[in-house]
């Protein structure tokens, strides 16, 4: 059976064996894969049933025959889809198939090769499709100081491709930098994020919070903006007042005491995400690696469902997040946040719910390109105040400016 012609001739002379083979063929098995797997079975069938013997029906639970069929699937999956198995199993099936010539087998990228390739590219792919936030011109020394405070506290995009940097000069990004993006700024600088926020008036000049609130009250025609999160008090002690909240952010939430997460929360969830990491990594290898045409939502969803868990998806209008950088063009955007087992995975922002969800899934999947993922306790903004949250990050994680939480993290645990 050195060729397809010889296999066809053998099956023509042994119709009972041909009929038996059709019964063990997989329902969704392609003709090419079945052609080679069938040859694998025929080459080793005599070792199980004896030379010239008709194999027993599949439902008889013949152990040796079942083992042969399993080996044939292992060999086909390894050759044609890149599946990896223990070295002893691989050596066994390769020995059983040593005389089978496969001329059109695809090439596959292993997870280690994939990680090395991503590292070689640097961080350029992690910010794909994300544009820099615009920097406004300084109107005066006073406004200039305030503007620099706003820009310093805005998420900065690093290592962005040149064409994306050119586009970003006049518009805000549709996607938000996820929690997995590396940001080398010191963690303590995050505490000053909301000391000064300003809204734009009709002539493009920044207004203090109190003026912005009154100037943006006419609704529906231009769409309303929430007042910025914090305005400066006039008192000499330079303390800051409570942020102005939108309709969905009640004063009751602001008065609730903040709970604290402990290492027990992270230890309890880490084993699950270790298993999820392996599942996603192998699915990426089977799909030929991370690419723009990959269905990130399906890949992550099926991986989580295979571990008997549920992915939590939350949507909220961008204008309802007072801590999220906004401009006039982004008022109607939607923010999507992904969680699993109350752990934050990623966030996306877009003009539609589908766009926001696609960005969030893409950024979440990118996290699994790293060598390891860990659950950590990080600081995020919620309703204008700092709260603790459980966040999935890579082992080389440095505290970045995480986007504000859509829901109170402590109410999700």
UniProtKB/Swiss-Prot annotation:
Residues 183-193 have a biased composition (Basic and acidic residues). GO terms for cellular component: nucleolus; nucleoplasm. It is found in: Nucleus, Nucleoplasm. Residues 118-266 are annotated as: Disordered. Its main location: nucleus. It comes from the Eukaryota. It holds the Pfam family XTBD. Keywords: Nucleus. Transmembrane segments: none annotated. InterPro entries: XTBD. Residues 21-118 form the XRN2-binding (XTBD) domain. PANTHER family: CDKN2A-INTERACTING PROTEIN, NF-KAPPA-B-REPRESSING FACTOR-RELATED. Belongs to the CARF family. May regulate DNA damage response and cell proliferation. This is Protein CDKN2AIP homolog B. It comes from Xenopus laevis (African clawed frog).
């Amino acid at each position: 059976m050195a060729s397809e012609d010889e296999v066809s001739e053998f099956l023509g002379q042994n119709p009972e064996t041909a009929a038996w083979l059709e019964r063990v063929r997989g329902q969704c098995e392609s003709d090419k894969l079945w052609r080679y797997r069938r040859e694998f079975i025929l080459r080793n069938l005599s070792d199980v049933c004896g030379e010239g013997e008709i194999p027993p029906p599949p439902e008889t639970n013949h152990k040796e025959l079942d083992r042969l069929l399993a080996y044939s699937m292992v060999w086909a999956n390894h050759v044609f889809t890149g599946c990896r198995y223990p070295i002893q199993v691989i050596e066994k099936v390769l020995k059983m198939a040593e005389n089978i010539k496969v001329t059109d087998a695809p090439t596959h990228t292993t997870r280690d090769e994939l990680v090395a390739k991503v590292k070689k590219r640097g961080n350029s792919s992690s910010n794909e499709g994300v544009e820099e936030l615009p920097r406004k011109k300084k109107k005066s020394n006073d406004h200039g100081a305030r503007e620099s405070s706003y820009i310093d506290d805005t998420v900065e995009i690093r290592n962005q491709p040149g064409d994306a940097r050119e586009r970003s000069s006049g518009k805000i990004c549709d996607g938000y930098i996820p929690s997995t993006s590396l940001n080398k700024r010191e963690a303590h600088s995050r505490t000053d994020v909301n000391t000064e926020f300003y809204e734009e008036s009709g002539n493009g000049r920044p207004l203090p919070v109190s003026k912005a609130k009154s100037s943006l009250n006419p609704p529906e025609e231009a769409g309303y903006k929430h007042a910025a999160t914090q305005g400066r008090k006039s008192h000499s002690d330079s303390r800051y007042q409570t942020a102005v909240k939108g309709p969905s952010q009640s004063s009751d939430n602001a008065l609730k005491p903040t709970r604290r997460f402990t290492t027990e929360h992270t230890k309890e969830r880490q084993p699950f995400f270790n298993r999820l990491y392996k599942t996603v990594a192998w699915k990426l290898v089977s799909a030929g690696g991370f690419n723009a045409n990959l269905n990130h939502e399906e890949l992550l969803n099926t991986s989580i469902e295979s571990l008997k868990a549920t992915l939590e998806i939350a949507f909220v209008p961008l204008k309802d997040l007072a801590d999220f950088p906004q401009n006039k063009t982004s008022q109607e955007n939607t923010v999507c946040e992904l969680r699993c087992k109350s752990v934050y995975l990623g966030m996306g922002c877009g003009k539609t719910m589908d766009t926001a969800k696609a960005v969030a899934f893409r950024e979440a999947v990118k996290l699994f390109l790293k060598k390891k993922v860990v659950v950590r306790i990080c600081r995020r903004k919620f309703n204008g105040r700092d709260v603790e949250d459980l966040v999935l990050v890579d082992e080389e994680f440095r505290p970045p400016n995480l986007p504000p939480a859509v829901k109170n993290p402590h109410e999700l645990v």
